[in-house]
Amino acid sequence: MSCNGCRVLRKGCSENCILRPCIQWIESPEAQGHATVFVAKFFGRAGLMSFISAVPESQCPALFQSLLYEACGRTVNPVNGAVGLLWTGNWNVCQAAVETVLRGGSLKPIPELLNGGGFAGFPSPTSDEASEICTEMLNLRKADDSGDRNIYHHCRFSSSRSRSRSTASPPKRKRLSSEQQPSSELDLSLIPIYPIKTLPFKEDTPSMYSEESVTTVSFQNNNAGDRYVRCGGGGGGATTKLLNLFA
């Protein structure tokens, strides 16, 4: 047999229905249907099923009850919801809204709770200690609202100005007196910035004008066809055999 929740939502129901244990704490079948329709309209059918499937089965009744109270509190007090009604000492308003939904009635926002930006539901200072603390917090907020807002805007605009100054291009530096006066000498930038690496000169290497230069004399041996070179200046010097690589 289909449960009352699946029946009003017109969805298939089975033995493993996750919606059935959520509404068992509600006594009458009509009240179960009214609560299911109200919560499904507020959070959406897909959202309701997503919330229920995300918790264990043992926590489903508490979850559905929390969703029902939040939906009723947010309807009568759109600014603060059920938590705001509990904080301001108007929890009886939320309970009355839940009973109205279970009977099949309709809810609408209460104007007394909307005045003052949603903080008009605070009790008088003569009620109890918790209400006195809430009232003092409200008075402090109202007293410091304009000042805090001015400080906030001042900080925000100051930070934006400083950010714009930091991102802007830096001002041109003033030229030095030496830069302003024209120089009489030409600056052709011929002097290198980095030092030139010099290699040491090998003194043992003979130059072409020294006496130790090699005089190459090519003559062919009649017998072997080899080439020889004569080393040393003048007419003397040793004769060295060269390999005939191009023969």
Swiss-Prot record:
Residues 157-184 are annotated as: Disordered. Signal peptide: none annotated. Coiled coil: none annotated. It comes from the Eukaryota. Residues 1-107 form the LOB domain. Residues 157-170 have a biased composition (Low complexity). Pfam families: LOB (PF03195). Expressed in young shoots, roots, stems, leaves and flowers. InterPro entries: LOB. Belongs to the LOB domain-containing protein family. This is LOB domain-containing protein 38. The lineage of its organism: Eukaryota, Viridiplantae, Streptophyta, Embryophyta, Tracheophyta.
